[in-house]
Amino acid sequence: MELWPGAGTLLLLLFLLLLLLLPTLWFCSPSAKYFFKMAFYNGWILFLAVLAIPVCAVRGRNVENMKILRLMLLHIKYLYGIRVEVRGAHHFPPSQPYVVVSNHQSSLDLLGMMEVLPGHCVPIAKRELLWAGSAGLACWLAGVIFIDRKRTGDAISVMSEVAQTLLTQDVRVWVFPEGTRNHNGSMLPFKRGAFHLAVQAQVPIVPIVMSSYQDFYCKKERRFTSGRCQVRVLPPVPTEGLKPDDVPALADRVRHSMLTVFREISTDGRGGGDYLKKPGGVGEAGL
């Protein structure tokens, strides 16, 4: 089939127009820049996962493959001009299993996680991630634990297996106890699965707090610039001797300590900036 006369010229003009339009949108529209950056962020992770899969497949499903993923993802913060400052890393217990609990703000949490991720540590993620193309397969090969949150019985069974794995294989797990991303600049109530897990295995809980991203990232405002994020590792919370009845108080105590630190590092000029001081940020009423 032949193209009508002038079709090639028209396609060339459309291509040139697109080349001119993209830079214009980039420099003149913060919203367009936000979508471009997020699209590249997700696409780049999927591409890196494609590269990681053959390397990880040599070992099969193995926690050690998380080191490969971490190595391949660490550079992303430089692409976006995000400086990640880690404090308190000495609080990680050196030679025992434990449960990490961290606040969950957006997919950018991956940058802070990779910066501070301890050895033999894998995240617990929602099962939907398993079907996220190359990223899902790479995560599976790295030993990420997937849970179907809609099926409570299955989730409890998986957590019981994880408790045994913690003790027998010296593995650490990373959990986002809020259960979902929280964009409002505070912390959602904690789900108790991670705390039941720690109490069942009688291993410590290591809280990790990432400062607010509001100075450089806001989904609602379609804003994504460069900035700094502080990741604070808090002292481990022991669970020896605790029973299931102690879990609610334990979860509340850990959340309170994390929220206090979150407010501190998100307003001191070294973390997420002064968002919490602004109208609409987290004040006493937001708690």
Curated annotation (Swiss-Prot):
Could you give one GO CC term from the UniProt record?
A: endoplasmic reticulum membrane
Q: What class of enzyme is it?
A: transferase
Transmembrane region(s): 38-58, 128-148
In the record, which residues are listed under signal peptide?
1-26
Taken from the record's topology, the Lumenal segments are 27-37, 149-192
* GO MF annotation terms: 1-acylglycerol-3-phosphate O-acyltransferase activity
| EC identifiers of the protein | 2.3.1.51
**Pfam name, any one:** Acyltransferase
What InterPro entries does the database record attribute to this sequence?
AGP_acyltrans, Plipid/glycerol_acylTrfase
Please report, in chain numbering, the residue ranges of the motif HXXXXD motif. Answer: 104-109
Q: Which SUPFAM superfamilies match?
A: Glycerol-3-phosphate (1)-acyltransferase
How is this protein situated with respect to the membrane? Multi-pass membrane protein
Biological process (GO), any one: phosphatidic acid biosynthetic process
* Keywords from the named record: Acyltransferase, Endoplasmic reticulum, Lipid biosynthesis, Lipid metabolism, Membrane, Phospholipid biosynthesis, Phospholipid metabolism, Signal, Transferase, Transmembrane, Transmembrane helix
Which residue ranges does the entry give as Cytoplasmic-facing topology? 59-127
Q: Which reaction does it catalyse?
A: a 1-acyl-sn-glycero-3-phosphate + an acyl-CoA = a 1,2-diacyl-sn-glycero-3-phosphate + CoA; 1-(9Z-octadecenoyl)-sn-glycero-3-phosphate + (9Z)-octadecenoyl-CoA = 1,2-di-(9Z-octadecenoyl)-sn-glycero-3-phosphate + CoA; 1-(9Z-octadecenoyl)-sn-glycero-3-phosphate + hexadecanoyl-CoA = 1-(9Z)-octadecenoyl-2-hexadecanoyl-sn-glycero-3-phosphate + CoA; heptadecanoyl-CoA + 1-(9Z-octadecenoyl)-sn-glycero-3-phosphate = 1-(9Z)-octadecenoyl-2-heptadecanoyl-sn-glycero-3-phosphate + CoA
Cystine residue pairs: none
Domain notes, please?
The HXXXXD motif is essential for acyltransferase activity and may constitute the binding site for the phosphate moiety of the glycerol-3-phosphate.
| Family as reported in the entry's similarity comment | Belongs to the 1-acyl-sn-glycerol-3-phosphate acyltransferase family.
This protein's name: 1-acyl-sn-glycerol-3-phosphate acyltransferase alpha
Q: What is the lineage of its organism?
A: Eukaryota, Metazoa, Chordata, Craniata, Vertebrata
